[in-house]
From Swiss-Prot:
Keyword match Cell membrane: yes
Lineage of the species this protein comes from: Bacteria, Fusobacteriati, Fusobacteriota, Fusobacteriia, Fusobacteriales
Organism: Propionigenium modestum
Described function: F(1)F(0) ATP synthase produces ATP from ADP in the presence of a proton or sodium gradient. F-type ATPases consist of two structural domains, F(1) containing the extramembraneous catalytic core and F(0) containing the membrane proton channel, linked together by a central stalk and a peripheral stalk. During catalysis, ATP synthesis in the catalytic domain of F(1) is coupled via a rotary mechanism of the central stalk subunits to proton translocation.
Keyword annotations of the record: ATP synthesis, Cell inner membrane, Cell membrane, CF(1), Hydrogen ion transport, Ion transport, Membrane, Sodium, Sodium transport, Transport
Protein name: ATP synthase subunit delta, sodium ion specific
Length: 174
């Protein structure tokens, strides 16, 4: 809970800076890249998390890795290092994306199907969801053969379960 609050607070501040610099998308990509590196590179993670390594040394290391970034992006990475919040990068990125989606009327939708839908089926689903919600839809599709057929759509807290598995479970319970 506290980690989510921290992520939200930092994400809001970073988003505000990104808006004022007109680089919202670029900064998201930067933060996402930092998160990927933090999650996959043990040496990087160890270095930025190690309490005995001075912050200035951590910043120098980050500058060597991210030196090609524009100054505002690099300063945000430095700020997160200064505040010992780089370890919270996953939560910050998730909250940043939520803010971006909310401000740009984008809805994150997860669709689970028994088999991979065609491009046309995905496009039709996106079109119907956009028409229903009045928002642009970011569709993430996953496959789960255990649902047998049909699909499950998750929009925020709402779940629309049209799977054969659920229908069979309903019949079995009655």
């Amino acid at each position: 809970m506290i980690e989510a609050q921290v992520g939200r607070r930092y994400a809001e501040a970073i988003y505000e800076i990104a808006e004022s610099n007109d680089n919202v998308k670029e900064l998201y990509e930067t933060l996402n890249g930092v998160m990927e590196l933090y999650n996959t590179d043990k040496e990087f993670k160890t270095l930025v998390d190690h309490p005995l390594i001075k912050r200035e040394d951590k910043k120098e290391f980050a500058k060597k890795i991210f030196g090609e970034l524009e100054e505002s992006s690099l300063n945000i990475i430095f700020y997160l290092i200064e505040k010992d919040r780089l370890s919270s990068i996953r939560g910050i990125v998730a909250e940043y994306l939520k803010i971006y989606y909310a401000k740009n009327q984008i809805l994150d939708v997860e669709a689970i199907f028994a088999i991979e839908p065609t491009k046309d089926q995905k496009a039709k689903l996106i079109e119907q969801l956009e028409k229903k919600t009045g928002k642009k839809v970011n569709l993430e599709v996953s496959i789960d053969k255990s649902i047998i057929a049909g699909g499950i759509i998750k929009i925020g807290d709402e779940i629309i379960d049209g799977s054969v598995r659920r229908q069979l479970d309903t019949i079995a319970r009655s």
